């Protein structure tokens, strides 16, 4: 599994899930990000996350395919 560390911008408390998937480059577009979330392919802290705009915060771990994204 490929580990990616994502640091929230200073002053930001969260990033929407679909924005995170685009920002780290594991999906090609926002519509693709929405599709993989809606299909139940993304896990947040070990649980399937179906909310496209879920607020991802520091300490969360997102998993999709062979990627593990740790939020700082």
Please report, for each region that a protein language model flagged, where it lies by residue.
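A basic, amphipathic helix-loop patch mediating RNA/tRNA/ribosome contacts
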Residues: 15-55
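A detector for short, charged/polar N-terminal pre-domain segments
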Residues: 2-15
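Short, Lys/Arg- and Gly-enriched loop/turn segments at beta-strand edges
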Residues: 68-72
């Amino acid at each position: 599994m490929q580990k990616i560390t994502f640091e929230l911008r200073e002053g930001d408390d969260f990033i929407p899930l679909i924005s995170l998937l685009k920002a780290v480059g594991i999906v090609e577009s926002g519509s693709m990000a929405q599709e993989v979330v809606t299909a139940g392919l993304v896990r947040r802290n070990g649980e399937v996350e179906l909310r496209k705009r879920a607020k991802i915060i520091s300490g969360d771990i997102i998993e999709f395919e062979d990627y593990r994204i740790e939020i700082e």
